[in-house]
Amino acid sequence: MNQRIDDAYKNCDGISRRGFLQIGALSGLGLSFTDYLRGTAQAKPANKTNCILIWTRGGTSHHDTFDPKPDAPVSVRGEFNAIDTAIPGGQFTEIVPNFAKHADKFALLRGWNPRNGSHGTADQWVMSGRRFNAAVAYPTYGSVVSYFHGFQSALPPFIQLNDHVDRRFGGGTSGILGLEHNPFVIDADANADNFSVRDITPPEGVTFERVDRRRNALAKIDALQRRADLQQDALKAQDEYYEAAMNMITAPETKKAFDIESEEDATRDAYGRHRFGQSCLLARRLVESGVQFVTVTDGGWDTHQNNFKSLKDSRLPPLDQAIPQLIIDLEERGLLESTLVVWLTDFGRTPKINSASGRDHWASTGFAMMAGAGVPAGHVLGATDAEGGYVSKDEYFSEDIATTIYQKLGMPSDLIAHGPEGRPGQLIEGKP
């Protein structure tokens, strides 16, 4: 199971002083000693393309965002009007005005057929691109990147911001690849005044100079142990593991990546002074610092009740502000061509509005969004019928989305991963 970095700790600073310098300092990665050795042994040159994946847990309504049906009966079209977008002839709903304004900066997939309407299995299927199979836990995208490219800097190759993933069936996890490729989960509010990352932030009173002194003391103890222990290879490997932990804790790029307060106020304001907005800003900073795959998660999208009020008042405004700004910011910094931005969700919502002013799970249609990394912007792919219930043109599946993601990340089309027992697993089944 993935070990969250904000799980049980020994004091209010986050971790015990003694535990801070133990090999367990990498526990936030879900690593054991042998796990680490496997991960470093498999490290390969990094691809030049990184990825930021937005995951909205619960199933975001396509009707009320990017696939409005203004001519449908009121029981289908809902409460929101359709507005024009930057794409000639394209329309979104009025509660995503910023997306509409910048629709020429991303590609919208309206022809997605999720073929599933259940939570949990959705997290596994959509975030891996492989149909749910109870016998095989297919890895999520970031875990595959970790598996094939490994550590390329002091920071982990795969980081997840916020903890809105249903892991009952292995969704969002490394699955068959082993715990060492699970995401490094940061479930701390990036918008908080005291934002810090546990397990890589020294407890109060422990300076980095003090860390170095402790490291030198431990090195002397280790030297004595070596004289009495003939397992030199194991000790050397342990040194490498320990050094990786120390590098992550003490490396300047680690502190710089998470120092979100160093951003100009105007930049932070542009993303939005809310948890989701600052998480997107932090994702950009992590990519700049060498993290190859960042997943930003958000919850509360299972709108069986009060769908319209929830979307308008709380759920959509932060995303409507932050995601277009993320794309713009990456572009202005020259990072968009080397960074794929993807927005995925469980599935769509029912065309017909229920008695609780909500929409239920819908397994036949939904949406996805992509930008950057050479994705043709300003295009709408696929279409749905008059009520948004079924794909009427250019149908795409989660397997096809996975193929596109892996293609942009430079993965081979015949991508095979081997589990801990050596069993091969094919990871790509769709078309780009």
Predicted regions and their residues:
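Ligand-binding pockets and gating/stacking loops
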Residues: 1-432
